[in-house]
């Protein structure tokens, strides 16, 4: 993943392009930039409210295509080129089930460009103010997209508005998804975590090349939502990420979120499923890997529907131990961080996919059945959850709202707050937020009870109201929402510049210290203190202690929840 990739035969061509670029100046409709692999030609775009255009470079390779023998392998250095490379077309999507990408497009009221799909997908896009050039040394913000590690793309996000309004470079990256990104034989033949290795390769490319686009390689902030935020939280815990980034923003996702780890039994079962398809002995990893590398992309996609337990693993390299253990041992990269959640993470997008029936309303019996099924809390102990969450709740809508809040607490809010405490106690400055605004564009398309749902903050961070290109992120934004978007872009960019989101003309954002103050992001921004403190205590203290005292047999999934959330209590008691 390292080394000098310059080819001597390129020298004369580069001299010509350098001379041409000097004559042409930094502001041009066809910006040219040097990289260690060869020259690239981008294009320019504009955003609403700004005269200055933004330079856009699409589809720059940061690794060799992971095809053939490189499938289920660590990413290799990209292949250099001799001629000027056009970087004006969107790269292919990484292989994924397109059905949900299209469904999300409708549910989120966004529009994406037409994109191809291929395993040859390890590319990144760059958005830079047109004045940015070698020596500008602007802050760099690298977006790692989400999508449950199953869907997503660099090209469904447009960094133009954030770049030109805040004078930063925005880079959006791609990484392998699903079985392509996480298949493992649980040994040295295919240790797994390919998606995380892809992210490391992209960050290495940024470190070695971003200065030629006007970015500062010593001021790189990684930010992302959902699976992207989980990736960032994971990169913070990996020893391999040293010097690749300097600040981190985690939007609705951290590495200790329950359900990220599959049980050993599930992995063994799915390996056997794969072996049966390949007509191989499951113990013959080399033969199994050879068979899988000969399968078509579509065959692997079909196989992934039968074998869904391939997720992140402790491989002894990217992860030396489980994320919770690394956090508790303070084995993490100490960087300034922003961690945040939305005030109804499981309000609509997530349940409409997995449990749409509860959106119409629920009774207590149905709610408890879902809790038992999804969280594996023993039936005899569901009364504890009933007392905490459903006391005094009788109407179907009240029970539904409470149930959705419970799932949001378990999967996003409590893990986020627990992670923030670990980061704080490890010595890194932490800022926490709760996004609370329901976007106006959903006025007629979402149920009225839905507040700020999962991913709703993204359109504000990217300046969605000001975009006018192929990616439409926020039509029908109100004037108040445009102002909120400006403020959020400013907070995020200030943090990318200095590690502190505060700045002139912005409501103060307190650091997340022992007082646990946080920012409430809405059209009227305010601060709060000890977000959902009672719920955090319930999931990290009350319920685990009762279950432990009763010696209840816990499922692997729920054991992970309890371990993830109880450890801060146990550690503080031991200290």
From Swiss-Prot:
Its EC number is 3.1.1.1. It catalyses: a carboxylic ester + H2O = an alcohol + a carboxylate + H(+). The keyword Disulfide bond applies. Residues 1-28 form the signal peptide. Disulfide bonds join 94-121, 280-291. One of its GO terms (cellular component) is extracellular region. Keywords: Disulfide bond, Glycoprotein, Hydrolase, Secreted, Serine esterase, Signal. It is found in: Secreted. SUPFAM superfamilies: alpha/beta-Hydrolases. Pfam families: COesterase. Gene3D superfamilies: alpha/beta hydrolase. GO terms for molecular function: carboxylesterase activity. Glycans are attached at residues 134, 281, 363, 524. Involved in the detoxification of xenobiotics and in the activation of ester and amide prodrugs. Belongs to the type-B carboxylesterase/lipase family. This is Carboxylesterase 5A.
């Amino acid at each position: 993943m390292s080394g000098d990739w310059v080819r001597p035969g390129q020298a004369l061509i580069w001299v010509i392009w350098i001379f041409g670029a000097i004559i042409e100046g930094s502001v041009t409709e066809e910006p040219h930039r040097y990289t260690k692999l060869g020259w690239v030609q981008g294009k320019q775009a504009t955003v609403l409210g700004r005269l200055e255009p933004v330079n856009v470079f699409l589809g720059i390779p940061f690794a060799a295509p992971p095809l053939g023998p490189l499938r289920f392998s660590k990413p290799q250095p990209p292949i250099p080129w001799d001629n000027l490379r056009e970087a004006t077309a969107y790269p292919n999507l990484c292989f994924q089930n397109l059905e949900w990408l299209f469904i999300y497009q409708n549910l989120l009221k966004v529009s994406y460009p037409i994109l191809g799909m291929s395993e040859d997908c390890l590319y990144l896009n760059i958005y830079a103010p047109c004045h940015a050039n070698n020596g500008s040394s602007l802050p760099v913000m690298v977006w790692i997209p989400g999508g449950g590690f199953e869907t997503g793309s660099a090209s469904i996000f447009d960094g133009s508005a954030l770049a030109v309004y805040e004078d930063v470079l925005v880079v959006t990256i791609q990484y392998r998804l699903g079985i392509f990104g996480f298949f493992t034989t649980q040994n040295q033949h295919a240790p797994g975590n390919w998606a995380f290795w892809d992210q490391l390769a992209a960050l290495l490319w940024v470190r070695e090349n971003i200065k030629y686009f006007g970015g500062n390689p010593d001021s790189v902030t990684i930010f992302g939502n959902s699976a992207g935020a989980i990736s960032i939280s994971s990169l913070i815990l990996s020893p391999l990420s040293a010097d690749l980034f300097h600040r981190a923003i985690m939007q609705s996702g951290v590495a200790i979120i329950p359900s990220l780890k599959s049980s050993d039994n599930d992995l063994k079962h799915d390996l056997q499923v794969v072996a049966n398809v390949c007509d191989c002995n499951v113990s013959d990893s080399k033969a199994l890997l050879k068979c899988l590398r000969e399968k078509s992309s579509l065959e692997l996609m079909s196989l992934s529907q039968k074998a869904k337990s391939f997720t992140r693993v402790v491989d002894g390299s990217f992860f030396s131990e489980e994320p919770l253990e690394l956090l508790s041992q303070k084995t993490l990269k100490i960087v300034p961080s922003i961690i945040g959640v939305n005030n109804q993470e499981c309000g609509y997008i997530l349940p409409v996919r997995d449990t749409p029936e509860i959106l119409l309303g629920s009774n207590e019996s149905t709610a408890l059945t879902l809790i038992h099924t999804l969280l594996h809390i023993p039936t005899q102990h569901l009364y504890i959850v009933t007392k905490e969450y459903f006391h005094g709740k009788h109407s179907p809508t009240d029970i539904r709202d409470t149930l959705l809040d419970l799932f949001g607490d378990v999967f996003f809010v409590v893990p986020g707050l627990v992670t923030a405490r670990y980061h704080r106690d490890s010595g890194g400055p932490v800022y926490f937020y709760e996004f609370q605004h329901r976007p106006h564009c959903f006025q007629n398309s979402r149920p009225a009870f839905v507040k700020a749902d999962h991913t709703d903050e993204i359109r504000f961070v990217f300046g969605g109201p000001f975009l006018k290109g192929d990616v439409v992120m926020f039509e029908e934004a109100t004037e108040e929402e445009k102002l909120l978007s400006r403020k959020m872009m400013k907070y995020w960019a200030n943090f990318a510049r200095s590690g502190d989101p505060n700045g002139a003309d912005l409501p103060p954002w307190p650091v997340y210290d022992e007082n646990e103050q946080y920012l409430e992001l809405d059209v009227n921004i305010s601060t709060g203190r000890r977000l959902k403190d009672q719920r955090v205590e319930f999931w990290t203290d009350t319920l685990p202690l009762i279950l432990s005292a009763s010696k209840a047999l816990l499922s692997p999934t729920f054991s992970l929840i309890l371990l993830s959330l109880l450890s801060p209590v146990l550690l503080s008691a031991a200290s």
